[in-house]
Amino acid sequence: MPAPEPTRRAKKDASASPSPAHPASRELVILTGLSGAGKGSALKAFEDLGFYAVDNLPIELVPRFAELVAQSVEITRATLVVDVREGQSLAKFPQILQEVRQTLQTTVVFLEASQAVLLRRFSETRRPHPLGREEQVVHAIADEKQRLEPLRNVADMIVDTSRFNVHELRAYIQSKFTREGNAKSMLITCMSFGYKNGVPLDADLVFDVRFLPNPHFIPQFRPLTGKDAKVVRYIRKFEQTRTFLDKVTELLLFLLPHYVHEGKSYLTVAFGCTGGQHRSVMIAEEIAKRLGKKSYRVKAEHRDMPR
């Protein structure tokens, strides 16, 4: 199935807060979302990571499944799919999720994509929408969004797969759920973006760097990016740039050990400028280098930088 890009959100209500009493070695991932958004590909990615995978388990059986995983000798990580085929039972999901979280550390991952992308995928695969052949796909998508709203509202991660292909979705799942043994195993993503394209939904921390001088208005810098040495030197020469880098680094070095202590396995720190080409790219690269020197697992991603 064609293409799936990301998003993440942590809910603060009781239904979305994993119990801290559960051992970190055991976990359940509930995979849900819109038809055509890539649940099948994501499920295979979880299987490749060693998760015990179940497709479309009835909602009423999820608490019992969680108990079996919690008691199992062989299964320590499991994922299951809940989708629109559950019908009216979907309204019960938030309550059932609270029950499951009393048994097992649980993460809800909700996959979605833009309407245009979903329509293209259904057209390319020639598969009917699960809500019916006779209904226009555009109406079926709208109906499905409404039915799945209770699940989306309690999701820990909302992943927009519009920009992903199958391989990129697989890599994204692996980057978020691969386990490492060292104390700094949390994966930190320093992401640049352009505000004109919206704030990344998977960002945990967002910094607006539009206060920095903009290289876009200097003709020789306009076709370059924040990874080019000339642009880097230009942005770095300003005192506010150096002060900002130092203060953000100091803040992150304070925050990161606390995130690790709370069991967080991934963190996305996003830096935004107008277009996502110069300032945010330079800052994301520099912060990633600084954190890497402190032995954190870190990578830089540039959502909107021209390639």
From Swiss-Prot:
InterPro entries: P-loop_NTPase (IPR027417), RapZ-like (IPR005337), RapZ-like_N (IPR053930), RapZ_C (IPR053931). It comes from the Bacteria. Signal peptide: none annotated. GTP binds at residues 83-86. GO terms for molecular function: ATP binding; GTP binding. ATP binds at residues 33-40. Residues 1-23 are annotated as: Disordered. Pfam families: PapZ_C, RapZ-like_N. Keywords: ATP-binding, GTP-binding, Nucleotide-binding. Residues 1-14 have a biased composition (Basic and acidic residues). Displays ATPase and GTPase activities. Belongs to the RapZ-like family. NCBIfam families: PRK05416.1 (NF003828). This is Nucleotide-binding protein ACP_0619.
